[in-house]
């Protein structure tokens, strides 16, 4: 065993954190190693990883990380995080610009944000074990459609700026008959939204035209010149309320698509965009109970009119029925998405912001329509009171209708007013030397309103009762919203707590058992890593606060940039991307810009292996690159002959190749360096997808094997939880020559980034996210993970991740073929179980096996990727031997069940697999007309492995096993019915009656 493993239970000092992050104890690790034929976890690394990869570190198989500190214990790491947090100065930030103070109800913070039942689950691809999240996401969609007055909404996008960009791209697809390639945007758009839109437009060849949409003399000639769409903020960045219906009518007449960017809270009082002629509405739901978090994470939304359902990007939850005819939720219209349509998908988005959408939905359920309206009235009343008081004090407050944002005009005196507010602990929006803006939010109290008025030279005597908003009738909301009973049923803490508990019990998270999804790395999210996320120093910081207020966060960001650069071998890192898919787009856009800067404008071909994740092809398309697919060999490796042929056929046009290492086939390819060399010799760049970096951390570096740029997944490799489908963080690491093309930001307080070998570099590309550093409030999780593990701990985690995958492969290979293996017959951190022979022989499909695993108490592995009819299993280092064996026992038992179907013992149309999963309602039904027992159907895992577990001293009490049973709330969901009868809003209560 390695020294790190031997010290796991030592008596000298506290146990290292890595000994609790890794699931198995020392004796079990020794047993696992001996079972697969190695002497230690370290040996599996040396036997499985090709020497060409291990030797990439100048003959030393230990990655050099000179800035990486040794592992800290939890007390020390927490103390350091407290010190870092103390470097932040949290003021009363009334900056606005898309980020607002909000009050997260404690019942939501405690029962969702801080609850592993919610934050450790995966994207709800398996609907039967995701009904709680899917119900909340349906509520979120109902909330959005109600407030925007449109027909259908998705269940979240990454942030407001990317939602606006997705809206532009949707408009381009939907208005394909329009020949014009021009897209109109309002002059008064948030700066960060404009920059992200411009970046996507540049990548896809769209011409963005800025015009004042409040001035017909400005916008009318632009519309008449032709456009395929328009983006109209409502209210706009100056705070002004205006009616965009005239603009929308004109754009419709030329065949374009109209998009409104809306403040969601304001729509409780304002006419919904759907009633004003918008085809699409986008925006952020951040102010629905989600802290600003120095930029994120937050859930953005998009809603569309009827007829655009198949154009909408991202996840869409629909209502279907299960095998017993009961209503059930599931992801709808998945044929739009990247994992199926690849480069033809509506978007490259994969991870979204499920956890934050759930928080926003819960906030709406908690307050209901009456409560939300009260909050909105309070916000706008206080804003109008402040405006009246400041106007009475002689300040030039813009004479415009507004919801929450006051615009003060001066002649060079804006900074003086800003300084006065800062002295009193308030940070306002200094637009320029002449303009100061104040955005009021729900956290502003009457006392603070008076204090701020005095600081700016006004009199509190002028703050009186509710001010006259004087909004015109055509901007006042008259339609009802949030009328579904769910929005009026849970307004006491007892009822809300129990409702959230019931939904959580419907789901399967890591708090219940292993989630062995291949290519997903569902590892432990330790409590010690999670706790800083909700500290006010991180959660209450505004992303556009002055740089001096963010010293702590900037220090943490710098640490992460340096540590990740050292682990990957690259020169620089950007933490801005909010997901792995966004990281892919960022890296590929940097490559495209790099080629253009050198005059190589013809280099627009991205080579993508046939085995690649669908996101790769979709990201290449979103970055303006043409996808050319490279074949794979029978052993899963890249076909270098086909690669050479594709390079030759596209001579002078190769921009990049996208590869994943280890490969998506779950093996370490020996020829990866040769592949990189071939592309470099053709003038292309090498993008290495970091989705599988958990199998390489501490033992190999992407840059050393030929990579020019990679994205990582902090929500996989570096312990940020998946949140049931987001948040994620997808940082991009790159070599120095690509650094200038990584994303900058128009409002970045620090655009200089550290270089791996010292010095700094500026990232000057278009922003890809609304916030300068993306989702800063979850970065302490990865910082804590790295600080607690240290390099040796990370190496140990990699060793055990690979060890566990090979143990599963070893236990199952006699009954279920392992599709691909690498050198010495080993897999990497995941293995592909080939169920195709079983299906051919028994008729039992991969879907049947996945659903039957639910009865055994497991989330299914990844289905039919990268090969149809297979399961890809990734156990991670966090699972212990008992859980690995429980999974293997279940898989072997399922094989035997399939053989009983093959033998005719059970009919093909009535057996435990075809009927899986078995919800509790079937167990207690009066009739049981199946050729197998209720126990076998509903409790199949109760008696597995008893003798072995007894020998290990484990609890084999069947009562205990029964008590631990996970019950799916529904039977198998009918996906086809759900797509043919598309319903994406909350079903009426009577739908759930018997």
UniProtKB/Swiss-Prot annotation:
Region of interest (Disordered), residue spans: 1-20
Domain of life (superkingdom): Bacteria
GO biological process: glycine decarboxylation via glycine cleavage system
EC number: 1.4.4.2
Keyword Oxidoreductase on entry: yes
CDD domains: GDC-P
Name of protein: Glycine dehydrogenase (decarboxylating)
Species this chain originates from: Cutibacterium acnes (strain DSM 16379 / KPA171202) (Propionibacterium acnes)
Phylogenetic lineage: Bacteria, Bacillati, Actinomycetota, Actinomycetes, Propionibacteriales
């Amino acid at each position: 065993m390695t020294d790190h493993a031997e010290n796991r239970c030592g008596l000298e000092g506290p146990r290292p954190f890595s000994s609790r992050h890794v699931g198995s104890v020392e004796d079990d690790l020794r047993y696992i190693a001996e079972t697969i034929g190695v002497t230690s976890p370290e040996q599996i690394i040396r036997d499985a990883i090709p020497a060409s990869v291990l030797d990439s570190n100048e003959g030393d198989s230990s990655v050099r990380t000179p800035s990486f500190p040794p592992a800290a214990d939890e007390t020390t790491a927490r103390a350091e995080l407290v010190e870092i947090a103390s470097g932040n100065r949290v003021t009363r930030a009334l900056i606005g610009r898309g980020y607002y103070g909000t009050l997260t109800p404690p019942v939501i913070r405690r029962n969702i944000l801080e609850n592993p039942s919610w934050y450790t689950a995966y994207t709800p691809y398996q609907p039967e074990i995701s009904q709680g999240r899917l119900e909340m996401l349906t509520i979120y969609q109902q909330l959005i459609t109600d407030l925007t007055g449109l027909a259908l909404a998705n269940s979240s996008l990454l942030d407001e700026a990317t939602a606006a960009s997705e809206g532009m791209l949707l408009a381009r697809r939907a208005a394909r008959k329009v020949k014009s390639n021009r897209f109109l945007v309002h002059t008064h758009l948030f700066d960060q939204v404009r920059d992200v839109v411009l970046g996507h437009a540049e990548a896809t060849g769209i011409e963005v035209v800025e015009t004042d949409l409040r001035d017909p003399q400005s916008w009318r000639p632009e519309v008449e010149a032709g456009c395929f769409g328009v983006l109209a903020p409502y209210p706009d960045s100056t705070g002004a309320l205006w009616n965009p219906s005239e603009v929308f009518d004109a754009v419709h007449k030329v065949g374009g698509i109209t998009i409104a960017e809306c403040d969601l809270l304001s729509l409780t009082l304002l006419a919904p965009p759907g009633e004003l002629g918008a085809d699409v509405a986008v925006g952020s739901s951040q102010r629905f109970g989600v802290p600003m978090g120095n930029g994120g994470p937050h859930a953005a939304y998009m809603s569309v009119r009827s007829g655009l359902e198949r154009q909408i990007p991202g996840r869409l939850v629909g209502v279907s029925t299960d095998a017993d005819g009961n209503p059930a939720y599931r992801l709808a219209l998945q044929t739009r998405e990247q994992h199926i349509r690849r480069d033809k998908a509506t978007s490259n988005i994969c991870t979204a912001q499920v956890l934050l959408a759930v928080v926003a939905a819960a906030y709406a359920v908690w307050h209901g329509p009456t409560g939300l309206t009260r909050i909105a009235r309070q916000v706008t009343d206080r804003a109008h009171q402040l405006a009246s008081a400041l106007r009475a004090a002689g300040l030039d407050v813009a004479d415009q209708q507004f919801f929450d944002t006051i615009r003060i005009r001066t002649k060079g005196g804006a900074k003086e007013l800003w300084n006065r507010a800062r002295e009193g602990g308030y940070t306002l929006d200094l637009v320029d030397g002449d303009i100061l803006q104040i955005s009021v939010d729900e956290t502003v109290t009457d006392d603070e309103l008076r204090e701020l008025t005095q600081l700016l030279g006004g009199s509190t005597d002028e703050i009186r009762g509710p001010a006259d908003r004087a909004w015109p009738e055509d901007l006042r909301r008259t339609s009802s919203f949030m009328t579904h009973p769910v929005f009026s049923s849970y307004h006491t803490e007892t009822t809300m707590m129990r409702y959230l508990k019931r939904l959580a019990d419907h789901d399967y998270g890591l708090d219940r058992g292993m989630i062995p999804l291949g290519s997903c790395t569902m590892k432990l999210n330790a409590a010690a890593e999670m706790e800083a996320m909700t500290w006010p120093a991180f959660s209450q910081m505004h992303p556009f606060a002055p740089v001096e207020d963010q010293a702590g966060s900037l220090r943490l960001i710098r640490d992460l940039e340096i540590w990740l650069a050292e682990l990957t071998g690259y020169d620089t890192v950007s933490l801005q991307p909010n997901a792995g898919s966004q990281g892919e787009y960022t890296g590929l856009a940097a490559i495209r810009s790099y080629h253009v800067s050198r005059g190589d404008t013809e280099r627009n071909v991205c080579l993508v292996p046939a085995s690649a994740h669908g996101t790769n092809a979709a990201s290449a398309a979103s970055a303006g690159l043409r996808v050319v697919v490279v074949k794979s060999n029978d052993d899963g490796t890249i076909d270098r002959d086909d690669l050479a042929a594709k390079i030759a056929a596209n001579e002078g046009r190769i921009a990049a190749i996208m590869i994943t290492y280890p490969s998506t086939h779950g093996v370490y390819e020996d020829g990866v360096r040769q592949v990189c060399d071939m592309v470099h010799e053709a003038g292309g760049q090498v993008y290495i997808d970091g989705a599988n970096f958990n199998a390489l951390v501490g033992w190999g570096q992407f840059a050393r094997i030929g990579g020019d740029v990679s994205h990582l997944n902090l929500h996989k490799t570096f312990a940020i939880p998946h949140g049931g489908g987001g948040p994620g963080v997808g940082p991009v690491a790159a070599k120095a020559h690509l650094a200038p093309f990584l994303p900058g930001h128009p409002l970045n307080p620090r655009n200089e980034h550290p270089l791996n070998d010292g010095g700094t570099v500026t990232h000057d590309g278009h922003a890809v996210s609304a916030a300068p550093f993306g989702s800063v409030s979850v970065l302490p999780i990865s910082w804590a993970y790295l600080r607690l593990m240290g390099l040796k701990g990370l190496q140990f985690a990699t060793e055990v991740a690979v060890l566990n995958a090979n143990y599963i492969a070893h236990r199952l290979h006699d009954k279920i073929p392992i599709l691909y293996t690498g050198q010495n017959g080993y897999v990497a951190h995941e293995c592909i179980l080939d169920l195709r022979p079983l299906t051919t022989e028994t008729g039992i499909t991969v879907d049947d096996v996945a659903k039957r695993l639910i009865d055994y108490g497991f989330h299914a592995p990844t289905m039919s990727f990268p090969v149809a009819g297979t399961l890809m299993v990734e156990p991670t280092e966090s699972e212990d031997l008992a859980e690995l064996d429980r999974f293997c026992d279940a898989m072997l038992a399922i094989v035997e069940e399939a053989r009983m179907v093959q033998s005719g013992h059970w009919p093909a149309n009535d057996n435990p697999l075809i009927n899986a999963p078995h919800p509790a309602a079937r167990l207690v039904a009066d009739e049981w007309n199946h050729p197998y027992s209720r126990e076998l159907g509903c409790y199949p895992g109760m008696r597995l492995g008893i003798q072995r577990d007894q020998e290990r001293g484990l609890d084999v009490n069947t009562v205990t096993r029964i008590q631990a049973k996970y019950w799916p709330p529904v039977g198998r969901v009918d996906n086809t019915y759900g797509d043919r009868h598309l319903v994406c809003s909350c079903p009426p209560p009577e739908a759930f009656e018997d």
